[in-house]
């Protein structure tokens, strides 16, 4: 086992705080509408230019192991806030730095670290309750657009496109972000349920222009096994032909005689049919077929539940207003399922999302919710260079997370104002002893830090602006973008409550751990062994000419 380097007490905390300051100073430069850019070197290719706090934090590794431990712990604050709320990483870092710096000073002055931590925790608890009281629900598209704009560093086009996407696919809908091919941002919306399986034969195509098979008001047969014998399908085909409607067959596989018969019937115009493979594999396939059944008001024909294909009737089939089948995708639009049943199914899947620990499973379950709840929107980010594209895509993803958080827990006035307003609730607290009260005071000063940093980045004097904001009430604050004072909600400067809350709670959590740290252990630096001296010539061979 390698030897360890151990530091205690003040020496350990000083080094740790030094690391915190290095990371926080780099990250906080990006805060606010007038935040600066940070350039990140890449091991290959052009450097990345970003105003995203978590991207900056992730790049930082320090040479001194003890300083690096401090930096890594604050990096954890940024990452955790990003995971919880999708934004607020820079705010969380600024709060953590303020709490740790003041806390370390208090410990150096001889105060009890545990009492300081208790005081900070008490203050944060009161501040979170006050934030929830200040919070207003997000209902209209305008508020959603404003939240997106602020999170995307005041880029209105990003805020508007996110609001439009949410309007089209609903609050539960899946919105994904991709790199586009043009200069402008584009929104592509797929309504209804789409899955990545196309027609099994090109003879099913009935729309030559789009090279797709379009079915209006079709019946939908869902089966979880292979269909190779046409006799099994006859009762269903006869029923559909009598009704004079087209038919979509979704099964594990349609092959051989069954597929040939369907193609012949379609070409002759006897019955319009399209066959596609069921999406997914194994249990996921069964679950997706069940989702389709709920969406279309049909039943999955499965021997597991005692339903045989040859016994199926037209009553077991689902319905939809329209189905479009291309070479690669099938889209079911406006299924005839009962809305209460669909909602119950969505609730069931959401419970599974909460229970799963796998990110992959969670993503797939969220996709299923979206397909049942309304559709999928794809935001295609446009830019003129690859560097700009990467930076813009990161901002769009941040803004999207922030708007989701706003829909979830509501919004508070932005620009650091919400934390300043929460000071009132914290200011009335007193601790069980003097050290705890000092912990509360540390939290009070730290909660001013985000506003101070936004103002400093805008080139103004933080204390002057802060005092003026404190004199106001409610949404009154400072718009750093144009230097005006006024109602932050009217200015459109809003922060999701979840983002501000997560930033404060995560910062306090790490600060509490660091203040109460008394020893640090790291691998001792290895001393390089001197290289062996170069060997001379062989003895007894003098005089030989080499």
From Swiss-Prot:
Q: Which Gene3D superfamilies match?
A: GroEL, GroEL-like equatorial domain, TCP-1-like chaperonin intermediate domain
Q: Which SUPFAM superfamilies match?
A: GroEL apical domain-like, GroEL equatorial domain-like, GroEL-intermediate domain like
Q: Which InterPro entries match?
A: Chaperonin_Cpn60_CS (IPR018370), Cpn60/GroEL (IPR001844), Cpn60/GroEL/TCP-1 (IPR002423), GroEL-like_apical_dom_sf (IPR027409), GROEL-like_equatorial_sf (IPR027413), TCP-1-like_intermed_sf (IPR027410)
- Catalytic activity field: ATP + H2O + a folded polypeptide = ADP + phosphate + an unfolded polypeptide
What Gene Ontology molecular function terms does this protein carry?
A: ATP binding; ATP-dependent protein folding chaperone; isomerase activity; unfolded protein binding
Q: Could you give one GO CC term from the UniProt record?
A: GroEL-GroES complex
Enzyme class, broadest EC rank: isomerase
Region annotation Disordered: where it falls in the sequence? 526-546
Pfam families this protein is in?
Cpn60_TCP1
Q: What are its E.C. numbers?
A: 5.6.1.7
Residue spans with biased composition (Gly residues)? 534-546
* Single biological process term from Gene Ontology: chaperone cofactor-dependent protein refolding
Location(s), subcellular: Cytoplasm
Query: What CDD domains does this protein map onto?
Result: GroEL
The domain of life for this entry's organism is Bacteria
Family in the record? Belongs to the chaperonin (HSP60) family.
Name by which UniProt lists this protein = Chaperonin GroEL
> Which source organism does the UniProt entry give?
Xanthomonas campestris pv. campestris (strain ATCC 33913 / DSM 3586 / NCPPB 528 / LMG 568 / P 25)
């Amino acid at each position: 086992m390698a030897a360890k380097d151990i530091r205690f007490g003040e020496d350990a905390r000083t080094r740790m705080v030094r690391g915190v300051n290095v990371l926080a100073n780099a990250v906080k430069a990006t805060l606010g509408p007038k935040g600066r850019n940070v350039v990140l070197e890449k091991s290959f290719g052009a450097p990345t230019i970003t105003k995203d706090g978590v991207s900056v934090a992730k790049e930082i590794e320090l040479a001194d192991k003890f300083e690096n431990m401090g930096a890594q712990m604050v990096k954890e604050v940024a990452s955790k806030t990003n995971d919880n709320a999708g934004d607020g990483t820079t705010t969380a870092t600024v709060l953590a730095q303020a709490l740790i710096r003041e806390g370390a000073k208090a410990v150096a002055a001889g105060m009890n670290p545990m009492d300081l931590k208790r005081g900070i925790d008490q203050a944060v608890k009161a501040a979170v309750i006050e934030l929830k009281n200040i919070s207003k629900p997000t209902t209209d598209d305008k508020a959603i657009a404003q939240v997106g704009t602020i999170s995307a560093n005041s880029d209105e086009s990003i805020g508007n496109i996110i609001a439009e996407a949410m309007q089209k696919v609903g609050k539960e809908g899946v919105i994904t972000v991709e790199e586009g091919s043009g200069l402008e941002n584009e929104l592509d919306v797929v309504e209804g349920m789409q899955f990545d399986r196309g027609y099994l034969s090109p003879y099913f195509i009935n729309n030559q222009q789009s090279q797709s098979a379009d079915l209006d008001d079709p019946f939908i047969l869902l089966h979880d096994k292979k269909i190779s014998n046409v006799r099994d399908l006859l009762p269903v085909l006869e029923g559909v032909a009598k009704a004079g409607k087209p038919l979509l067959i979704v099964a594990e596989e349609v092959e051989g005689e069954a597929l040939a018969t369907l193609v012949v019937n379609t070409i002759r115009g006897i019955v319009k049919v399209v066959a596609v493979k069921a999406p997914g594999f194994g249990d996921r396939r069964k679950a997706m077929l069940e989702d389709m059944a709920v969406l279309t008001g049909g039943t999955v024909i499965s021997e597991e539940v005692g339903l045989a294909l040859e016994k199926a009737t037209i009553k077991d089939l689902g319905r939809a207003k329209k189905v479009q089948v291309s070479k690669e995708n099938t889209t079911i639009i406006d299924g005839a399922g009962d809305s209460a049943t669909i909602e119950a199914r969505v609730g069931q899947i959401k419970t599974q999302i909460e229970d799963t620990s796998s990110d992959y499973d969670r993503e797939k379950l969220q996709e299923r919710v979206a397909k049942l709840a309304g559709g999928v929107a794809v935001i295609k980010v446009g830019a003129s260079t690859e560097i700009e594209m990467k930076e813009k895509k990161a901002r769009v993803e941040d803004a999207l997370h922030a708007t989701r958080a706003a829909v979830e827990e509501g919004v508070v006035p932005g620009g650091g104002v919400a934390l300043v307003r929460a000071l009132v609730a914290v200011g009335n607290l007193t601790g069980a002893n003097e050290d705890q009260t000092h912990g509360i005071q540390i939290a009070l000063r730290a909660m001013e830090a985000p506003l101070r940093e936004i103002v400093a980045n805008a080139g103004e004097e933080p204390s002057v602006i802060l005092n003026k904001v404190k004199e106001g009430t409610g949404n009154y604050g400072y718009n750093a973008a144009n230097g005006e004072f006024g109602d932050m909600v009217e200015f459109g400067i809003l922060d999701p409550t979840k983002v501000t809350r997560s930033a404060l709670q995560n910062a306090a959590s790490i600060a509490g751990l660091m203040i109460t740290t008394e020893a640090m252990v790291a691998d001792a630096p290895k001393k390089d062994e001197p290289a062996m001296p170069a060997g001379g010539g062989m003895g007894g061979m003098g005089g030989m000419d080499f």
